Amino acid sequence: GYAMALTDHLSVGVQMNYHLVRLPEAYGRNQAVTAEVGFMAKITENWHLGFSVLNLTRNKLSSYQEDRYSSLLRLGTRYHVSNKVIFLGEVEKNVDYPIRFKSGIEYSPAENVYFRGGFGTAPIEFSFGFGYHWKGIYKLDVGSAYQQIIGWSPNLSFTVQMK
């Protein structure tokens, strides 16, 4: 992905996502690339508001009943309570499903160490994870989410921030 500040209070970002889905033999596998674009506004020093759109092209997941990767519209907010605690909230609309509400908290007990927890509705989802950032460039984030329909989903990301 790539992001840039348009002004002191407004930023824009774009991101490409690679998806690989492998299911049992009868279903096979599929791969696709989706795009995301987002805007973030700095309302105050501690409060940010963002909006993003994911997969507007409605890429196909399979030919079965026109299955497609999700297309999402998201409006979110982030509030820094202190330099150690951040509250987050989001309203998400998948074009095929009802609106979801999500909330989360991030706690940093030490520099570059982060613990996270979250909750979502429709369907109910709980998530947790931790992150470690080093040298101001590298980020490793590990987590898991439990959703009432599909069960546990592990998450892993490694990010290199280029300036």
Can you name each region flagged by the protein language model?
Residues 1-163:
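Outer-membrane beta-barrel porins/channels
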